[in-house]
């Protein structure tokens, strides 16, 4: 796997769990001897939902809810077979979406 790159994108609603997952990935990759670039914070996606508080009238009374999706990017340069095995066995917290591109 020489001169290859693994790109890992992490997404989560809570930034603390996202940072702990990123720290686990970086620690396991550096322990096996691979070069790591990141975690790079990507722009936070913000979804805003506006609803009417009352059921039938009072349109001026509204409530807003937002959902933030935090994202991080980690590049692992020159991974070894040990690195890939360590990443496959890694136990990440729930609520973190992981996308891996080789």
Curated annotation (Swiss-Prot):
Look up keyword Iron-sulfur and say if it applies. Answer: no
Keyword Ribosomal protein part of the UniProt annotation: yes
Q: Provide this UniProt record's keywords sorted from A to Z.
A: Ribonucleoprotein, Ribosomal protein
- The residue stretches assigned to a coiled coil in this entry are none
The membrane-spanning stretches of this chain are: none
Say which domain of life the source belongs to: Bacteria
Q: Which GO terms describe its cellular component?
A: ribonucleoprotein complex; ribosome
Question: Which Pfam families does the entry mention?
Answer: Ribosomal_S10 (PF00338)
Molecular function terms from GO: structural constituent of ribosome; tRNA binding
GO process terms (BP): translation
InterPro entries per record: Ribosomal_uS10, Ribosomal_uS10_CS, Ribosomal_uS10_dom, Ribosomal_uS10_dom_sf
Q: What does this protein do?
A: Involved in the binding of tRNA to the ribosomes.
Quaternary structure, from the entry: Part of the 30S ribosomal subunit.
Q: Which family does it belong to?
A: Belongs to the universal ribosomal protein uS10 family.
- For this entry, the protein name equals Small ribosomal subunit protein uS10
